[in-house]
């Protein structure tokens, strides 16, 4: 009850918690390591490893994000949608660099592949309700990244 006194509404509490979790996730990334990596798919993988490490160390974040993703309240959905869109923009800046498009057979596919990976991440979030086997998810994700790289990159970038 005192929590609701402090925040006033469930909406304000969820908003605070969601932005707190988002901030914690952003801090998990080693930006210099990601920037030093010249390959899009390698940056995506490295960022994913950093994210999963943080989620393993802070299981409450995964639990909250999973419950928030299934929240039905229209007021909360707007806040969560906005926060998730901001998170996607942050991730795009983090892993998709302008020079990445030259490696793709069709340069315009770089942005589409990134968007597809974000949709994949949304699907993975839906698994949070049923418990998380991070190792299995990461193994599957690594295979997907490998497959995408070999299907979308020009031959000279596959060495």
Predicted features along the sequence, with ranges:
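Short, flexible helix/strand-to-coil boundary loops that buttress conserved ligand/catalytic motifs
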Residues: 17-18, 29, 59, 65-66, ...
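C-terminal peripheral helix-coil segments that are non-catalytic and often amphipathic
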Residues: 50-53, 89-97, 118-120, 126, ...
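Amphipathic alpha-helical packing segments from all-alpha helical-bundle domains
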Residues: 23-32, 42, 74-101, 111-119, ...
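Short, flexible helix-adjacent loops and helix caps
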Residues: 26, 30-37, 67, 100-103, ...
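Amphipathic alpha-helical segments used for helix-helix packing
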Residues: 55-75, 126
């Amino acid at each position: 009850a005192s929590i609701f006194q402090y925040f006033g509404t469930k909406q304000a509490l969820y908003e605070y918690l969601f932005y707190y979790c988002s901030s914690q996730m952003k801090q998990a990334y080693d930006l210099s390591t990601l920037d030093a990596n010249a390959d899009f798919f390698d940056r995506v993988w490295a960022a994913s490893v950093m994210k999963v490490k943080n989620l393993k160390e802070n299981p409450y974040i995964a639990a909250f994000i999973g419950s928030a993703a299934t929240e039905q309240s229209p007021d909360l959905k707007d806040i969560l949608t906005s926060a998730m869109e901001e998170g996607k923009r942050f991730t795009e800046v983090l892993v998709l660099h302008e020079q990445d498009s030259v490696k793709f057979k069709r340069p315009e596919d770089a942005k589409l592949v990134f968007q597809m990976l974000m949709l994949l991440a949304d699907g993975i979030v839906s698994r949070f309700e049923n418990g998380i086997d991070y190792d299995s998810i990461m193994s599957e994700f690594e295979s997907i990244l490998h497959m995408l790289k070999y299907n979308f990159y020009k031959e000279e970038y596959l060495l």
